[in-house]
C-alpha cells in the first residue's frame, strides 16, 4: 500500500483537547507503553472521524496494525462520547434563547435491503435517525442517540424525551410537518395542500419555512465529519460516533 502525507481541516484546539483527554485516560487505567503517543492516537482518531478513512488506510499511514488502529480509535471515540452534553444540560443552556430549532436527519449506512428497520421511506435509503437541536442562529446545540431509520421524526423526538423536556422548560421549538401532532411547545406549519390553504395560512407557512431553514446549517455541520456521510460500522456504534463528533464540535466552537 502506498502512503502519502495528507491534511486535516481541523484546528489545533481539537487535537490538544483530545490529546489531554487520552492522557487522562491512560493515567486512569495505568497504561505504560503504546505504539502511538496520546497525540498521535488523537490525530489518528480525528483523521478517521473527519475524513472517514478506513482503518486499513489509517493503519498504514501511522505504521501500526489494522487491529491496533481499530482499538485506538474505538477507545478515543468512547472517551469523547462520554463527554457529550445530555439533553437536560442543553435545555438548561437553551432556556435563555427565544426558541430552538428541531429537525431529524438520516445518517446513511451500508445496511442491506433485508434490514427493514433501518430503511427510511422518506429518504429511500438505509440509515439511522438522529434528532438535532439548533439555536436561532443555526448553531448545533445537541444531537440525539441514533435510532433505526424507519422511525419517524416525531416518534424519535418522543422516545428521546425532547418534546416533554423542552415543554417543561417552556422553550418554543420550530419544526417541520414531520412533527405534526407532537404537542407541547412545538410549532409546525399549517397542514394541507398549498392551494387549499388560505392566504393567511400561506403567509404563516412562508414565514415558518424561513425560520425553520436555519436548522440546515446545524445538520450540515454534523455532516462535515465525513464518516457520518456513509457509515460502515455496526449500528450499535453509531450513537457513540455521533456523540464523539458533537463533543469535538462544541470544543472547537467554544
Where are these regions (language model features)?
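Short, well-ordered secondary-structure "scaffold" segments embedded in the functional core
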Residues: 57-74, 78-254
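Charged, often Cys/His-bearing segments associated with DNA-binding zinc-finger transcription factors
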Residues: 1-32
